[in-house]
Design a protein with these regions (language model features):
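Non-catalytic terminal/linker segments enriched in charged/polar, low-complexity residues
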Residues: 1-158, 178
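P-loop/Walker A NTP-binding module and the surrounding RecA-like catalytic core of P-loop NTPases
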Residues: 124-127, 146, 153-381
Length: 381
């Protein structure tokens, strides 16, 4: 008998303790009637298995290529809209720097420095980019404005790609040898952590994985209730307990349930009280020990949710969580609502952390895998 069915009241939030349905009352046998000739049989239409249709196995190569091209075009348009504020801010500043410029001189580079810093790319990252530009100028590789623009674009892309790392967010399937694949989500309150977990669960589920959510933020009032709304909305089971419960105990129950039901991915919510770093560090360390005892290598990813609107404050949050939580990647939220999207480059350069996902809207599917090339192209085109 499956683990979560052994106790009637245990893991109620999985929604598996449904009442039995009464059998319908027996009816008297109908009276014998004269036989009626059956209608001629019509050939049944050929059915396409659901999995075959979803995976595109019922399509020709040309149809698959057309569908992929349409999806890529849709994603590109949505992403461009999301970073439009950052693009307009950066482009306007850079265009104003280059307007009327006929040659590359110290004054132009100083203005360019101010433009990049204003886009929240950050002082250290801006200095690095300009140093690369100056080397290109000294080598005569950069001798006009267009080559200067191309050099900046290339350097920003190089920074973002250099911080990339593989994980679930790389759109590869979850390794069969790991079950469940544990993703711990951290971040201060108010950055969109709960919303991100809901969207992340929906995305990973839509890729064919069985997902379970662990509501281990038992410190903040109504945290579990808010997560339960997203769990119901996405149809993903949730393990939760009353406020004040030891988060490690909630995680332990969730790990057991995930293994029993054969879940591919377990997404773990955590408390966001960064102001009490010592307690939070001890709590996260305990949770990591619990996860590691149940599944080798768990947690396999620790994603930090950062609000792009906060700009350089988000970079400082990332720096603090990197110390106490062993962050492996970033989810950048509210990218569609800020002109400070340059923070993605600053995080990648100064902390060496990959941007795994980007939140580009309010809808449940508005969480996309962060594509460095798409991001840089959207900023400059």
């Amino acid at each position: 008998m499956p683990f979560w069915r052994r106790k009637k009241d245990e893991f109620v939030s999985l929604g598996l303790n449904t009442p039995a349905v009464d059998e319908p009352a027996s009816q008297p046998a109908p009276e014998d009637l004269a036989p009626v000739a059956p209608p001629p049989e019509e050939p049944a239409p050929a059915s396409t298995p659901w999995q075959t249709s979803v995976l595109g196995l019922d399509m020709s190569i040309e149809q698959l290529q057309a569908r992929e091209a349409a999806l890529e075009q849709e994603f590109s348009a949505r992403f461009r809209r999301a970073v439009s504020a950052t693009r307009e801010s950066l482009s306007q500043r850079i265009d104003s720097v280059f307007a009327g410029a006929k040659q590359i001189d110290a004054a132009l580079l100083d203005e360019l420095e101010e433009a990049l810093i204003a886009a929240d790319i950050g002082v250290p990252t801006t200095m690095h980019v300009l140093e690369t530009v100056r080397r290109g100028i000294s080598r005569k590789e950069i001798d006009d404005i267009e080559k200067l623009k191309a050099s900046i674009k290339s350097e920003l892309l190089s920074i973002l790609q250099g911080a990339e790392a593989h994980g679930v967010a790389s759109e590869t399937s979850v390794p069969e040898s790991i079950s469940p694949y544990v993703m711990m989500i951290v971040g201060v309150n108010g950055v969109g952590k709960t919303t991100t977990i809901g969207k992340l669960a929906q995305r990973i589920k839509s890729e064919g994985n069985d997902v379970l959510i662990c509501a281990a933020d038992t410190f903040r009032a109504a945290a579990s209730e808010q997560l339960a709304i997203w769990a119901e909305r996405t149809g993903v089971p949730l393990i939760q307990q009353k406020q004040g419960t030891d988060p490690a105990a909630v995680l332990f129950d969730s790990m057991k349930a995930a293994k029993a039901r054969g879940s591919d991915v377990l997404i773990v919510d955590t408390a966001g009280r960064l102001h009490n770093k010592s307690n939070l560090m001890a709590e996260l360390e305990k949770m990591k020990r619990v996860a590691g005892r149940e599944v080798e290598g768990a947690p396999h990813e620790t994603l930090l949710v950062v609000d792009a609107v906060t700009g350089q404050n988000g970079l400082e949050q990332a720096r603090q969580f990197l110390k106490i939580a062993g962050v492996t990647g970033i989810v950048l939220t509210k990218l569609d609502g800020t002109a400070k999207g340059g923070i993605a480059v600053a995080i990648a350069k100064e902390l060496g952390l990959p941007i795994r996902y980007a939140g580009i809207g309010e809808k449940v599917d508005d969480l996309v895998v962060f594509d460095p090339e798409q991001y840089v192209n959207s900023l400059f085109n």
